[in-house]
């Protein structure tokens, strides 16, 4: 965004958080120019998608836990731990399935639900359990270890848009995102 601000000083971005189930319609109506999210098989034919990066789910937990000795975390490794789930109300099917693959056998008392990734990380930092999040630009937490989940799928994360034909700023925004892809994970 900093580079975009320099190239387009009159551009006035509006950043919104919408459930992935809603942004396709907003893009169709041109109520917004672009949306970032996980690739969905239900993408409308009139919309385009450019992949920015591919990501697995990460397991984050207190660095003092025995899990920190492992490089890759399996579902078996999580048997004795509560799981902190990211649940913003309306959740991406990708995030939902990625988390529930590891949480489905837990008792309700072993599950914590958080509306933001920051809250999930805060609970993990306080020792309530482990959190499972897409490994995308996660805020650093000094006392948390981060490990890859075994057997987890790799998910495509990118930008959805209707057209950038008459919107050079949008084309440049997508190009800048792709150039900065290394910083997403």
Locate the predicted segments by residue.
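Short loop/turn segments at beta->alpha junctions
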Residues: 19, 74, 115-116, 134
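A ligand-binding cleft/hinge motif common to bilobed small-molecule-binding domains
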Residues: 24, 38-45, 95-96, 117-145
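Secondary-structure junction motif
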Residues: 38, 81-104, 171, 184
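Flexible hinge/capping segments at coil-to-helix
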Residues: 46-57, 61-83, 168-171
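Ligand-binding cleft/hinge of the Venus flytrap
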Residues: 1-9, 76-77, 93-108
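Central regulatory/effector-binding core of bacterial HTH transcription factors
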Residues: 1-42, 113-114
